[in-house]
């Protein structure tokens, strides 16, 4: 697939003549049959969504997605967004410039009906781009997904929108949900999915209550309690016994802060209220607040060791010339088998000519499991049981769950340097 395909980059129109003709027809239809969901409150790009649709390009047999979001009162061109679309493997006859058919919600294509929900706008978080790139790689490279019917809805990374999306997915009669990588959205949605008997696969929602309270939730990453326990053990190994802990206002940050404080008590370390009295500072939260906190502390003249948490393990955290030994990030690790990591990296390099970012491996691993479920696997009503009791053999390693937690999930400590993040060896 070419790098400019709208399935992997937002805002680019189709370039081949047939696709462009089909897309123009798709734009004119602006049909609610595509399944878009209006937002009641101001959202990531505004209140009103128009021009939602999907087309399939027959020259590469890949999905092409396009949606347009427009804020009320905002001047200038509308911002291209993937907001809420239904995609099926039907050929839209794009190559010849023929009519592009809109697929209704009730698809005639057999196979799993899979809801995909996350924060899709890379301007709000770079993790959105990573998640969509994992979907693009899977659609191009993972066998078993051809019979899947997809339904995309943006959850805004917040609880209210997450619940709205869940209700819409249930009405759409989804068999399975993937995504909701924000803990805020995942928790509110998981309860509704549980009532409907729908499994939720999430690549990056770490909050403990997601799996403790919802047996239908399965995560492909460490939990807050594992991140917190591994972090505190690492702090103790460095003889940093007095710890100042802060968090942003997200559900993820607040829950991880609580887990860290509980782990400090179990380990016999001391939480101090003032950073001046601490050996080390810890900040739990999303990427943007973490980056801002790091910059603010250094600009304030603090040279005290600072540890950020999983969401900050991203190239978008930034580089630093003199932060080795001063700034760290605890995030998701990979198994010791180098072949597993190389496989994911090679697929990403093939399409995007770059190394994958945070959450890519977890997202791709989730999609490999989805492919096994979709490719002649259990019926929709048996998915929960299959996820609870099956070991899935994937190119990234074996996958199985213990009460919703990924067996063998690992963490890693990183430090920012002149060229970005590098692992800490001890």
At which residue positions do the language-model features occur?
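Hydrophobic alpha-helical membrane-insertion segments
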Residues: 12, 25-26, 38-42
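Extracytosolic ligand-binding ectodomains
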Residues: 1, 7, 17-23, 29-33, ...
């Amino acid at each position: 697939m070419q790098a400019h395909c709208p399935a992997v980059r937002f805002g680019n129109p189709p370039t081949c003549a047939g696709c462009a003709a089909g897309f123009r027809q798709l734009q004119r239809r602006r049909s609610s049959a595509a399944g878009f969901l209006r937002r009641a409150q101001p959202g990531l790009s505004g209140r009103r969504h128009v021009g939602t649709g999907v087309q399939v390009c027959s020259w590469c047999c890949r999905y092409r997605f396009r949606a347009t979001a427009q804020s009320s009162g905002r001047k200038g061109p509308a911002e291209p967004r993937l907001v809420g679309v239904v995609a099926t493997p039907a050929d839209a006859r794009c190559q010849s410039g023929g009519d592009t058919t809109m697929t209704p919600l009730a698809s005639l294509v057999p196979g799993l009906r899979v809801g995909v929900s996350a924060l899709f706008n890379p301007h709000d978080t770079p993790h959105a781009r990573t998640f969509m790139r994992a979907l693009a790689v899977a659609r191009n490279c993972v066998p078993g997904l051809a019979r899947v019917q997809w339904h995309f809805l943006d959850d805004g990374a917040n609880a209210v929108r997450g619940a709205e999306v869940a209700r819409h997915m249930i009405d759409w009669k989804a068999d399975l949900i993937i995504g909701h990588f924000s803990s805020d959205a995942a928790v509110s949605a998981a309860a509704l999915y549980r009532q409907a008997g729908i499994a939720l696969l999430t690549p990056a929602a770490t909050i403990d209550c997601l799996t403790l309270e919802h047996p239908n939730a399965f995560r492909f990453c460490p939990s807050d309690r594992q991140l917190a326990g591994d972090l505190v053990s690492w702090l103790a190994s460095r003889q940093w016994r007095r710890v100042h802990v802060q968090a942003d206002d997200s559900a993820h940050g607040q829950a991880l802060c609580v887990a860290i404080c509980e782990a400090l008590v179990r380990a016999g370390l001391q939480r101090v209220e003032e950073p001046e009295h601490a050996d080390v500072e810890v900040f739990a939260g999303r990427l943007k607040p973490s980056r801002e906190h790091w910059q603010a502390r250094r600009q304030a003249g603090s040279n005290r060791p600072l540890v950020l948490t999983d969401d900050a393990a991203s190239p978008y955290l930034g580089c630093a010339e003199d932060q080795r030994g001063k700034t760290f990030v605890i995030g998701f690790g990979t198994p010791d088998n180098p072949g597993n990591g190389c496989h994911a990296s090679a697929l990403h390099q093939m399409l995007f000519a770059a190394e994958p970012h945070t959450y890519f491996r977890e997202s791709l691993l989730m999609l490999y499991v989805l492919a096994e479920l979709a490719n002649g696997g259990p019926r929709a009503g048996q998915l929960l049981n299959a996820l609870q009791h099956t070991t899935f053999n994937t190119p990234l390693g074996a996958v199985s769950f213990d009460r919703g937690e990924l067996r063998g999930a690992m963490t890693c400590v990183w430090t920012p340097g002149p060229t970005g993040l590098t692992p800490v060896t001890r």
